[in-house]
Amino acid sequence: MNDRASVAATLENSPFFMPFSMNRQFKKHPRLLARAEGMYYYTPEGRKILDGTAGLWCVNAGHCRKKIVDAVARGVATLDFAPPFQMGHPLAFEFAERIAPLLPKGITRMFFTNSGSESVDTALKLALAYHRVRGEGHRMRLIGREKGYHGVNFGGTAVGGIVGNRKIFGALVTGVDHIRHTHDLAKNAFSRGQPKHGAELAEDLERLCQLHDPSTIAAMIVEPVACSAGVFVPPLGYLQKLREICDRHGILLIFDEVINAWGRLGKPFAADYFGVIPDLITTAKGITNGTVPMGAVFMKEDLYQAFMTGPENSIEMPHGYTYSAHPVACAAGLGTMDVYEEEGLLTRVGELAQYWEDAAHSLRDCPNVIDIRNLGLIAAIELAPRSGAIGARGMDAHLKAFEKTVGTAKDRHDEDVPGYG
């Protein structure tokens, strides 16, 4: 019995229920990662695996960076926990001050969470509460997009548009609608960067405004580049149209930048890259380079100030988490910002994007490739699905890549799209 077979036998009855995984398949054919360094993972047998997806779109600066590791070690040895409610610790305020200059113009305040899913649900609650404190409590409707991914909590799943993530859970949150996605193989296949066709799809939001009465809509949430569902790059002018419609009707625009942020497009935030400033931005992942769970919601100054109008002895936002602004996470975040700044990683993508684009599109003539999409250092290769076995070809590609020592990300929807980020 070889080592991997021995591991499989050990894992067969493991109590661990793995997330977003085919548990039975994995336990028969385990793919374990024992350590990491730089761009590579290492298996227990010592095989070197290229991390083609930056962990789960989060290890933007590479694995086990000494400056970040040292910051975490100092942090946990100094202050392992501090209550975030009615108390605080210096690193939370220091980290907020460190991030603030990187935010898009007009975005000034931040609320710390522990994950992208928490960031999304926090942003949705902030949007609803904002309208209520301004006397517009009738604005309760939330708008998402088909094929959108906004985490796995109830709010994020409800506004998300990936069928496989939604159907098992029933009705979820009420008062949610979706506009169409922008994926169009007929018009935009093999586009380099932003596709030319599809900006008019933003008008779906205007139609929903007319259907429901815009005064009932609280917020629209969208990923600037929809990554988890297969890398759908926004058509030219699309995000600008969404911003215009939201402004016209007093609807808050939320950018889910859990993946897009922290330099993946060559700017700290996708909002800067596209020149469209939302009202709220969600983030996580790269905020600590994936070392310690953390997320945040960034917001415009007027949103923050709307909550500051009540009595000073009142809690302005009855929301938060035990681990919000955790001191060790803040230490990791500060170490991460040091690495980003010292190595110019938030803007370096601009130097590499053309090389990455050419490399991705060089695979155009490979068997079964029906589309390649890219922007910045994000790309996806869409494969023709097998008849009667949607998703199988993409999973096979994922497994074979691992055997060839390359890590890939199988998308979370029902097409064959191995993604790279």
Write out the residue ranges for each language-model feature.
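Conserved N-terminal phosphate-binding loop of PLP-dependent enzymes in the Aspartate aminotransferase
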Residues: 1-421
